[in-house]
């Protein structure tokens, strides 16, 4: 069957701490404009959970859209309570992880509701070898239930390790996912110089998604060419060691040979106010906007 229109649902568009920032709001006299705006009806789009998206993919099977979650961080469960309930999303066909930071993996334990509640026997997790090893070390019971303590009720996962340098298929879903390796700061090994820390973006059909990066290698940029929808990291206006600034994101998009029809920034800090950013980005040559939690964008596979 012909594949149809698929949807990307923004589960979260904020940095690791999310927005609003509790330390801003507990000041005797709060002054953070973004955090204060998030408490008002007109500023509600400033409420941001950890960066994550849900892809609802029409793979041409004639069945329901396949639900593919990208990242399952600290705010996953509260985000799911909001967006899964609103859109009647139950089954998770796949979870793909970009990297091993807390805002990408620390909500995985909450996936137990899907497997302990007999909604599905297991959840398929797609990740790099590095991310798998971090999960194995940090949450050993997720990898082997024999490591469980207490009552022993733990989520059931089916891990699939993919290579960062070649496309991979998802079980029972007729689509290909292309990893987009990008730099996301550095890490340190004692006695050695700092090493580049790689995070994965992903291309699915005509949509490329990069949630965390400070540099896109030429080989990755080439894989993104031809994307009509591009979601890209843009933490704030000022430079930052592990994330694109607004200027860097703009310059990267401008460097693409094929101009995307739609660009969305994501991963904001509380230095970024949504309504002001809409106006700021509206003057760019390439149609660009700040994504917000709950926003839905169409793409094609």
UniProtKB/Swiss-Prot annotation:
Keywords, alphabetical: Cytoplasm, Hydrolase, Nucleus
GO cellular component entries: cytosol; nucleus
Subcellular localization, as worded in the UniProt entry: Cytoplasm; Nucleus
CDD domains: metallo-hydrolase-like_MBL-fold
Annotated InterPro entries: Metallo-B-lactamas, RibonucZ/Hydroxyglut_hydro
Molecular function in Gene Ontology: hydrolase activity
The name this protein goes by in its record: Putative hydrolase C777.06c
């Amino acid at each position: 069957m012909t594949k149809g229109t698929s949807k990307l649902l923004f589960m979260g568009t904020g940095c690791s701490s999310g927005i609003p920032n509790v330390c801003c709001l507990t000041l005797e006299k709060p002054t953070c404009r973004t955090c204060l705006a998030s408490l008002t009806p007109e500023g509600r789009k400033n409420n941001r959970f950890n960066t994550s998206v849900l892809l609802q993919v029409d793979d041409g099977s004639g069945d329901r859209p396949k639900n593919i979650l990208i990242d399952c961080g600290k705010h996953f469960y509260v985000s799911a309570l909001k967006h899964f309930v609103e859109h009647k999303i139950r089954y998770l066909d796949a979870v793909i992880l970009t990297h091993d930071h807390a805002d990408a993996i620390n909500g995985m334990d909450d996936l137990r509701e899907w497997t302990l509640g007999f909604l599905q026997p297991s959840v398929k997790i797609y990740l790099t070898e590095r991310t798998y090893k971090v999960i194995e070390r940090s949450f050993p019971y997720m990898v082997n239930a024999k490591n469980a303590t207490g009552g022993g009720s733990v989520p059931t996962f089916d891990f699939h390790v993919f290579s960062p340098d070649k496309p991979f298929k998802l079980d029972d879903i007729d689509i290909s996912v292309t990893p987009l390796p990008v730099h996301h700061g550095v890490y340190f090994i004692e006695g050695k110089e700092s090493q580049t820390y790689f995070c994965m973006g992903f291309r699915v059909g005509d949509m490329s998604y990069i949630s965390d990066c400070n540099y896109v290698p030429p080989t990755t940029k080439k894989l993104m060419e031809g994307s009509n929808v591009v979601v890209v990291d843009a933490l704030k206006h000022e430079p930052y060691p592990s994330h694109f600034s607004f200027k860097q994101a703009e310059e990267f998009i401008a460097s693409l040979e094929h101009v995307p029809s739609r660009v969305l920034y994501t991963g904001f800090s509380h230095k970024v106010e949504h309504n002001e950013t809409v106006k700021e980005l509206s003057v760019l040559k390439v149609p660009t906007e700040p994504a917000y939690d709950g926003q839905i964008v169409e793409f094609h596979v």
